[in-house]
Amino acid sequence: MERRNPSERGVPAGFSGHASVESGGETQESPATVVFRPPGNNTDGGATAGGSQAAAAAGAEPMEPESRPGPSGMNVVQVAELFPELRRILTINEDGQGLKGVKRERGASEATEEARNLTFSLMTRHRPECVTFQQIKDNCANELDLLAQKYSIEQLTTYWLQPGDDFEEAIRVYAKVALRPDCKYKISKLVNIRNCCYISGNGAEVEIDTEDRVAFRCSMINMWPGVLGMDGVVIMNVRFTGPNFSGTVFLANTNLILHGVSFYGFNNTCVEAWTDVRVRGCAFYCCWKGVVCRPKSRASIKKCLFERCTLGILSEGNSRVRHNVASDCGCFMLVKSVAVIKHNMVCGNCEDRASQMLTCSDGNCHLLKTIHVASHSRKAWPVFEHNILTRCSLHLGNRRGVFLPYQCNLSHTKILLEPESMSKVNLNGVFDMTMKIWKVLRYDETRTRCRPCECGGKHIRNQPVMLDVTEELRPDHLVLACTRAEFGSSDEDTD
């Protein structure tokens, strides 16, 4: 992975020079000029166009297009000369009475050329890069120098990764790595990340095709020089696909930041975190598990999109889930520990059927709901505020304290209460017109089904016997008016 001297300005390898980029190195014939012909003036327009072509053939200077401002001008206007970008999309009708727009399909060659132009622009852009990661390591003679942050991420030299390069070696040597948008990368073996790094994908696609159980293992075991803005492992703007991969994409034992990363069609876990993890602006499409937060982990998941995932978020540690959107997910979030759930919008399945996956987190087997709060004898209820649920189901297990959702819209939502949790739910601060509340009375042992569980195994589930308790828990709006403080506005949050 030899890299040219970053101080030398010029065209990167694999690209043409400026002359060939601008003019192609060849003289191309310009396409035929498109001429506006107003109705009733075809003779003059044809004569003018013919005169221009004849003058061009004779070697004389072409005449300037005559035009008059305003929509009523009857002179000929050569639009292609005024706007060259319209040459390919404007044609003249057969009768010559007007113009017709032609919609051109975007071919693969045009998309490739656009990606190459974007890559050329990114690689030739001037940046204040003055030092390499190896030079920073050489300057650190002792542990005190390792702790001092003398440089920032902007000053670190970027290495542009080629499709044939080794991911692990490039991250170890250069730390700041960028991917080319016009290339497709392939991961064929496990990538161990043992130092802080900053990977900018620029929208490039990375296909994972390996038989290993993990694609990226983030485990920093050594001390590395500190760089301001490069805290842990940072990965941004990368599209991951893995149609033939059945393992975990990211297994993080160190600080991990995923910014604007997309995951497409993974039949296993996308992100499994055992420590601090921040997932921001990511998208999960048709994945089995999106983000799994193991015990003692701290996760921040915000502004993400979950679409058609079996299990979006599994929280076994301390999680903060804010400003996310979920659509057609079997279970958006399974809460086994404490969590903060705010400002999320969740739409349930379009089909009128429940999820067939179980959870055995509290020792009992229950069907996973769209938002599932598992029972825990020592944990408090999650903070549940400013969420919008549509065609969803909410499972509430037994916990300490009172579950008090604040300003949540439960539209066409079913709430399932376990036997001990009915007296611990207060729904005075929700929009409750179309919600339904059911309480589990007992479990019928004569009606059992064997279902797959989120733990990876299969369990037998007893069918619950439920009772409709909607009116028992719905507040009396003739006594508790909607103008009270639960739905009011403060100085910080005005209507």
Swiss-Prot record:
Q: Where in the cell is it found?
A: Host nucleus; Host cytoplasm
Positions of transmembrane segments? none
Disulfide bond positions: none
Biological role stated in the UniProt entry: Plays a major role to prevent cellular inhibition of viral genome replication. Assembles an SCF-like E3 ubiquitin ligase complex based on the cellular proteins ELOB, ELOC, CUL5 and RBX1, in cooperation with viral E4orf6. This viral RING-type ligase ubiquitinates cellular substrates and targets them to proteasomal degradation: TP53/p53, LIG4, MRE11-RAD50-NBS1 (MRN) complex, ITGA3, DAXX and BLM. E1B-55K probably acts as the substrate-specific adapter of the SCF-like E3 ubiquitin ligase complex.
> What keyword terms does UniProt attach to this protein?
Early protein, Host cytoplasm, Host nucleus, Host-virus interaction, Inhibition of host innate immune response by virus, Inhibition of host interferon signaling pathway by virus, Inhibition of host PKR by virus, Interferon antiviral system evasion, Modulation of host cell apoptosis by virus, Phosphoprotein, Viral immunoevasion
Instruction: Please give the residue positions where the record annotates the modification Phosphoserine.
Output: S489, S490
Q: Which gene encodes it?
A: E1B
Positions of modified residues (Phosphothreonine): T494
**What's the entry's take on its domains?**
Contains a PML interaction motif that allows the subnuclear PML localization.
**Record note on quaternary structure:** Interacts with host PML-4 and PML-5; this interaction promotes efficient subnuclear targeting of E1B-55K to PML nuclear bodies. Interacts with E4-ORF3 protein. Interacts with E4-ORF6 protein.
Family as reported in the entry's similarity comment: Belongs to the adenoviridae E1B 55 kDa protein family.
Q: Provide one Gene Ontology biological process annotation.
A: symbiont-mediated suppression of host innate immune response
Q: Indicate the principal place this protein occupies in or around the cell.
A: host cell
Q: Where is this region: Disordered?
A: 1-74
GO CC terms in record = host cell cytoplasm; host cell nucleus
> Tell me, what's a Pfam family for it?
Adeno_E1B_55K
User: Compositional bias (Low complexity) at which positions?
Assistant: 40-60
Q: One MF term from GO for this chain?
A: protein serine/threonine kinase inhibitor activity
Q: Output this protein's name.
A: E1B 55 kDa protein
